[in-house]
Amino acid sequence: MSKFYKSGRVTTAVIVALSLSACARFDARTQANGDFDYVQTPRGEHYQTAHFTQNEARDIYDIPALTEQQKRIGFLSSNVDIRPPTQLIPVIDGVVLEANNSDKTTVLFNAFNHTENMKDKVWTLLESYIAANNIEVAAKDSNLTQIETGMFRHQQAYGSFLFRTKVVRESSYRFTLNQPQGGQNAALTVEVLSYSEKNDNVDLKVNLTARSKKSIELRLVNDLLKYAYQLKESSELQVANSQPLPIKLGYDDNNQMVWIVDADFIVSWTKLPDLLALLRFEQVDADKNLGYYLVKFKAPNAKYWPENNLNSFELDNAEYFIQLGELNSGSTSITWLDADKKPLADEKVTEIYFSITSKIRDVLLLNENQSKAL
């Protein structure tokens, strides 16, 4: 009974601790731990040396009083935002943050060739980004390449499902695009015009000054760059889908028998599922970061192979790992592994390869060629 009581008491303590941690409001998460009673502590009086001289007294350790501007920014107690400043995340090449003393945030987009008009590209990207987010354009001057936006609204939940809090951020911005003299580069300046935060409909204190202002502007820049990256990736996938998938037998950098695709990883990753489906491999799982497909083979009837311009091959009805790797040449290796991640025999890898006839290899793998019923 004693052991049961202690166990129950520990369980209760854990539940209470989790509840307290989960109940923390968003604004409390931006503050240091503990109370702020120290601000009420009276300052000590200067040490009196009686009739001795105070010529050696130093004020180096005296705490200076806050200026009015520092008080507005929030340099005291609970007003101090302990979150680290937002950093630029350059997910696309050629983007750097301009170092300046301005209270505005400027990002440079560098061109990689002399024929590239980066200013026009960034302007088009900016218009597309605003439209994709359904943001109203409050003012626009094409001659000055300047846009003022309506409200961006971003909602995010914090905490566990039992103690979830909802934070809503609303903000508007001015974008100004310039082109430095003597170059094809573009400089995008972002200035936040208004910003507010609510935690479960309760207004939070926000200071649009110094580090806080720059963090807000950089968060938007990072979201813009993320959008640009997604557009770029989508465009690359469209190009990949219109290109053939040339495959040959060979060896990887570890001298392992593999299929080699004369294309980069993105192209190979995108188009390989169509080929695997044609060979009667059903996708079970996939992890792009680790570069593998987990597939399950189900042997078709004898008519399937000639109907789909394939040579038959024998393989156990089981699960297999298809591991993709990037070779030094820029090509992609495809390694065949069994369910225990052991390489298939070279003869079996070769047999599966030769099931792909010349009518299929090096041509576009169209969906209509893969959907014939058994």
UniProtKB/Swiss-Prot annotation:
<dbReference type="GO" id="GO:0043165">
    <property type="term" value="P:Gram-negative-bacterium-type cell outer membrane assembly"/>
</dbReference>
<comment type="similarity">
    <text>Belongs to the BamC family.</text>
</comment>
<dbReference type="InterPro" id="IPR014524">
    <property type="entry name" value="BamC"/>
</dbReference>
<keyword id="KW-0564">Palmitate</keyword>
<feature type="lipid moiety-binding region" description="N-palmitoyl cysteine">
    <location>
        <position position="23"/>
    </location>
</feature>
<keyword id="KW-0472">Membrane</keyword>
<keyword id="KW-0998">Cell outer membrane</keyword>
<protein>
    <recommendedName>
        <fullName>Outer membrane protein assembly factor BamC</fullName>
    </recommendedName>
</protein>
<feature type="lipid moiety-binding region" description="S-diacylglycerol cysteine">
    <location>
        <position position="23"/>
    </location>
</feature>
<dbReference type="Pfam" id="PF06804">
    <property type="entry name" value="Lipoprotein_18"/>
</dbReference>
<dbReference type="InterPro" id="IPR042268">
    <property type="entry name" value="BamC_C"/>
</dbReference>
<feature type="signal peptide">
    <location>
        <begin position="1"/>
        <end position="22"/>
    </location>
</feature>
<dbReference type="GO" id="GO:0051205">
    <property type="term" value="P:protein insertion into membrane"/>
</dbReference>
<keyword id="KW-0732">Signal</keyword>
<keyword id="KW-0449">Lipoprotein</keyword>
<comment type="function">
    <text>Part of the outer membrane protein assembly complex, which is involved in assembly and insertion of beta-barrel proteins into the outer membrane.</text>
</comment>
<dbReference type="InterPro" id="IPR010653">
    <property type="entry name" value="NlpB/DapX"/>
</dbReference>
<comment type="subunit">
    <text>Part of the Bam complex.</text>
</comment>
<dbReference type="GO" id="GO:0009279">
    <property type="term" value="C:cell outer membrane"/>
</dbReference>
